[in-house]
Amino acid sequence: MKRSVAVWLLVGLSLGVPQFGKGDICDPNPCENGGICLPGLADGSFSCECPDGFTDPNCSSVVEVASDEEEPTSAGPCTPNPCHNGGTCEISEAYRGDTFIGYVCKCPRGFNGIHCQHNINECEVEPCKNGGICTDLVANYSCECPGEFMGRNCQYKCSGPLGIEGGIISNQQITASSTHRALFGLQKWYPYYARLNKKGLINAWTAAENDRWPWIQINLQRKMRVTGVITQGAKRIGSPEYIKSYKIAYSNDGKTWAMYKVKGTNEDMVFRGNIDNNTPYANSFTPPTKAQYVRLYPQVCRRHCTLRMELLGCELSGCSEPLGMKSGHIQDYQITASSIFRTLNMDMFTWEPRKARLDKQGKVNAWTSGHNDQSQWLQVDLLVPTKVTGIITQGAKDFGHVQFVGSYKLAYSNDGEHWTVYQDEKQRKDKVFQGNFDNDTHRKNVIDPPIYARHIRILPWSWYGRNTLRSELLGCTEEE
């Protein structure tokens, strides 16, 4: 802090300052407004080192500077404003130690100090989560997030499967440069077989032998944040085949493509692939990419270029992670229903609401309502108000009989008693969501605008066989 130094040699009462006896001339401090007393060389002499804005022998007057040409004049303690960085000066009977100063500075966010002169280092409190790197800025901070996280504080996870394995991404959305045909054309290894963990005799995509620059392409149908990819090989005629390395390209229109680069360079990134035909191998994109179309270009293959895969990422909002139906984070007691069904009226075949978890396995692996009508519901208590941005549904089989919900409505509540049915904003009526077409394929619906609520109800509106449901909610608990 700059200080003006007024040096005055005081002898006796000649300048109106009491004569001090022997001892410390600066005790008590004769300097006002936070001035620092400095003993002089001669007995009874001292000087006052005054803070900015104060003058006179004992720092008792405030300096007002109207312009470079005008002489300083005395004014109130807030003129000129002693507060830095946009701080607001307020007249106050304030003390700094034992000294009356007459004002306080109200500092804007990001600054502190008596005169708001210090920039706060927000990174000291480690605001960046999940391995994010914090950079302190002037009155602010920024977080550089790992590829699979996003948000101001890297608080949103963005690494969920985008739907190749589960079937949210349809066959028509998966295309390729070529298809391998074997056994006189009877076996066709189409691109839409390239689904992670797919089973069967023909369970992957294989490029044609004469395809010198093969690729497989995923159309996500809208721009999404893509943070990684999982690859897997397969066996063809008993022989392991897989992709050892590959490149990634992306596009927003399917025509103009950009290759994913090594960070900070213009060099195409070559990703490590698989080392056998069955073990999945994941690569993350740091930084992630935002695109509607993603292409994978095999570089080195074992025998033929054979692939099963999944893309990882989330909606652009970043708030579209599974809330815990499949993982079990949502516990059994949080899932209730209007009624339940028992096959053959036997307790061991009870289709309880707690079984309504996406991809649940077993003979009894879903919720089925006791009645087939439009008054049935499956309810999830999220325990706290939560932003819900999507839902995935799935049917099931009861002793070989295919059952699923073909369409449904959604309702939400914060107290579990008063419910609101989600509306179609354009048509201004209850929104009916498209459900499933079979018992096993995932069907995802985006909830836009999102729901903010603690309790969510799925209201079956049409069904095949019986109201049978496995499900997952997508969203996040919002944090600053």
UniProtKB/Swiss-Prot annotation:
Transmembrane segments: none annotated. InterPro entries: EGF-like_Ca-bd_dom (IPR001881), EGF-like_CS (IPR013032), EGF-like_dom (IPR000742), EGF-type_Asp/Asn_hydroxyl_site (IPR000152), EGF_Ca-bd_CS (IPR018097), FA58C (IPR000421), Galactose-bd-like_sf (IPR008979), Neuropilin_MCO_CoagFactor (IPR050633). GO terms for biological process: cell adhesion. GO terms for cellular component: extracellular region; plasma membrane. A motif (Cell attachment site) lies at residues 96-98. Disulfide bonds join 26-37, 31-48, 50-59, 78-89, 83-105, 107-116, 123-134, 128-143, 145-154, 158-314, 301-305, 319-476. Residues 24-60, 74-117, 119-155 form the EGF-like domain. The keyword Transcription regulation does not apply. It comes from the Eukaryota. Keywords: Cell adhesion, Developmental protein, Disulfide bond, EGF-like domain, Repeat, Secreted, Signal. Residues 158-314, 319-476 form the F5/8 type C domain. It is found in: Secreted. GO terms for molecular function: calcium ion binding; signaling receptor activity. Its main location: secreted. Residues 1-23 form the signal peptide. PANTHER family: EGF-LIKE REPEAT AND DISCOIDIN I-LIKE DOMAIN-CONTAINING PROTEIN 3 PRECURSOR, F5/8 TYPE C DOMAIN-CONTAINING PROTEIN. Promotes adhesion of endothelial cells through interaction with the alpha-v/beta-3 integrin receptor. Inhibits formation of vascular-like structures. May be involved in regulation of vascular morphogenesis of remodeling in embryonic development. This is EGF-like repeat and discoidin I-like domain-containing protein 3. It comes from Pongo abelii.
